[in-house]
């Protein structure tokens, strides 16, 4: 699939201005080691800019799977300074596994809302992934509650990926936090009854099947729409993206915020370069770094006021569910059990 990204040149130039928030330039020999489950190419421009402005070399180690196990096995001799991953569940697992440490940063605390960081400074959100409603262009719908997915009016009209995928167990966990386990079980049964096809595939497949007339609506992540609508004209991805619009749902019992998952990072428990690790995290939430990351990946920046990709901007302002994501994550196990109990993927 061919993706057309906006020009990053202006943003790379803007990153040169970000050095003003860094403390005195570090020695050229300074370094920081980043262990990340994210593809390095997605974050390399910011890391290069950080090195240019600070003199701190970033040693990037891509760990596709088993980040927790690797760092635990390395023990006190681990060279890891910063641990970066996606999904709040994965991040909390690193904390619970004892491989992160508490830090204090006024910069991070001022940029990142309290419900999107660890109260003890053991983890921080870097970007947001809102779980939204994909809607066929010919369906009139401007607002939606997640609970409405179980309404019989949508029978045979809903598409979604596996209920056991972390994107969906996260949403189910949020439903438990808002509405309770009993109501969430009934909701899951209602959603299953409204499915137009088996819960399977990926988020892009929701858009594909809306274009194909299989379903009218579906739950998926917003950033995929940025990728699809910015794909080359004539490609399948572009056709899928052009077939849908985005509505940000809210919870009936919980204000007017949308459920989000996150990408985030933490300082490793035995970080040999703790000060440099904190500097890197602070850089990653700076305005130009956030803008570059948001425009390259179409995720919503954690820092307010950052320029968005035009497609993402067209969705309107994101108001995040006020429940702390760490509180929602506590219900992940029960969410998975409920998905199995109702046979959601069968």
Please place each PLM-identified region on the residue numbering.
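A bilobed periplasmic-binding-protein/Venus flytrap-type ligand-binding module shared by bacterial periplasmic
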Residues: 132-139, 260-273, 292-295
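Short beta-strand->loop
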Residues: 35-38, 119-120, 135-137, 155-179, ...
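A structural signal for short loop-to-beta-strand junctions that line the ligand-binding cleft
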Residues: 78-83, 101-132, 147, 159-160
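Early extracytoplasmic/lumenal segment of secretory-pathway proteins
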Residues: 29-93
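An extracytoplasmic/periplasmic, membrane-proximal ligand-sensing/linker region
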Residues: 299-346
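Periplasmic-binding protein-like
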Residues: 157-164, 283-304
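Ligand-binding pocket segment of bilobal, Venus flytrap-like solute-binding proteins
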Residues: 174, 178-249
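Sec/Tat signal peptide C-region and signal peptidase I cleavage site
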Residues: 22-28
């Amino acid at each position: 699939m061919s993706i057309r990204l906006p020009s990053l040149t202006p943003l790379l130039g803007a990153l040169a201005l970000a050095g003003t928030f860094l403390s005195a330039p570090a020695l050229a020999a300074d370094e920081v080691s980043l262990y990340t489950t994210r593809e390095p190419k997605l974050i390399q421009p910011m890391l290069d800019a950080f090195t240019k402005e600070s003199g701190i070399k970033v040693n990037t180690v891509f760990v596709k799977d088993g980040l927790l196990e690797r760092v635990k096995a390395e023990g006190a001799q681990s060279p890891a300074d910063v641990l970066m991953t996606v999904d709040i569940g994965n991040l909390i697992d690193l904390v619970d596994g004892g491989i992160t440490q508490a830090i204090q940063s006024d910069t991070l605390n001022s940029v990142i809302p309290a419900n999107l960081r660890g109260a003890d400074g053991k983890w921080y959100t870097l970007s947001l992934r809102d779980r939204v409603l994909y809607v066929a262009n010919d369906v009139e719908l401007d607002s939606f509650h997640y609970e409405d997915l179980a309404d019989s009016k949508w029978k045979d009209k809903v598409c979604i990926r596996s209920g056991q995928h972390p994107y969906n167990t996260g949403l189910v966990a949020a439903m438990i936090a808002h509405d309770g386990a009993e109501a969430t079980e009934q909701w899951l049964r209602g959603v299953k009854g409204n499915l137009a096809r088996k819960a399977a595939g990926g988020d892009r497949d929701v858009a594909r099947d809306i274009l194909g007339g299989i379903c009218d609506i579906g739950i998926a992540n917003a950033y995929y729409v940025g990728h699809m609508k910015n794909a080359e004209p004539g490609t399948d991805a572009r056709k899928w993206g052009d077939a849908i619009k985005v509505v940000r749902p809210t919870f009936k019992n919980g204000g007017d915020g949308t459920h989000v998952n996150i990408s985030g990072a933490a300082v490793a428990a035995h970080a040999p370069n703790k000060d440099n690790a904190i500097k890197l995290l602070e850089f990653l939430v700076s305005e130009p770094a956030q803008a570059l990351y948001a425009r390259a990946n179409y995720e919503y920046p954690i820092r307010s006021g950052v320029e968005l990709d035009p497609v993402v901007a067209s969705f309107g302002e994101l108001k995040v569910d006020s429940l702390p994501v760490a509180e929602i994550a506590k219900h992940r196990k029960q969410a998975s059990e409920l998905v199995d109990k109702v046979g959601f993927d069968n």
